[in-house]
Amino acid sequence: MSKVLKLTSVTLAASSLAAAGYFYAFDRDSYHYKNASWKRIGDHVQGILDRKEDIAVQRTSSEARDVTVRPIKETMKDLWNEQVRNTAQWVYSFGSNTSTKA
């Protein structure tokens, strides 16, 4: 019985994989394959390498902007404090979720 079960499971797995591959690559004129994000990015990169497409460049603005520069030490301290607050909130959430049964 063990061999029949093993054969059935392998057959089921292979059939599922084949069906998924068929629906991905061939069904509806390869809709999912052609519209996959990794394929679009790959086609775009290939077009750039073949010099058929240009790289999109953002235009720089001529208006002045304020830029805030902070030391990395302050940024790390803020990130640390945020993590401590989130951890404390998570720990205290266990106490608020418990209900007392009378």
From Swiss-Prot:
Per the record's keyword annotation, is Mitochondrion included, yes or no? yes
User: Can you name a GO cellular component term?
Assistant: MICOS complex
Could you tell me which Pfam families the record lists for this protein? AIM5
Q: Where is the signal peptide?
A: none
Q: Which GO terms describe its biological process?
A: cristae formation
Q: Which InterPro entries match?
A: Mic12
Q: What is its main location?
A: mitochondrion
Residue ranges of the TM segments: 4-26
Q: Which UniProt keywords apply?
A: Membrane, Mitochondrion, Mitochondrion inner membrane, Transmembrane, Transmembrane helix
Instruction: Work out whether the entry's keyword set contains Zinc-finger.
Output: no
Subunit: Component of the mitochondrial contact site and cristae organizing system (MICOS) complex.
Please give the family membership noted in the entry: Belongs to the MICOS complex subunit Mic12 family.
What does this chain do? Answer: Component of the MICOS complex, a large protein complex of the mitochondrial inner membrane that plays crucial roles in the maintenance of crista junctions, inner membrane architecture, and formation of contact sites to the outer membrane.
**What's the protein called, per UniProt?**
MICOS complex subunit MIC12
What is the scientific name of the source organism? Lachancea thermotolerans (strain ATCC 56472 / CBS 6340 / NRRL Y-8284)
GN (gene name): AIM5
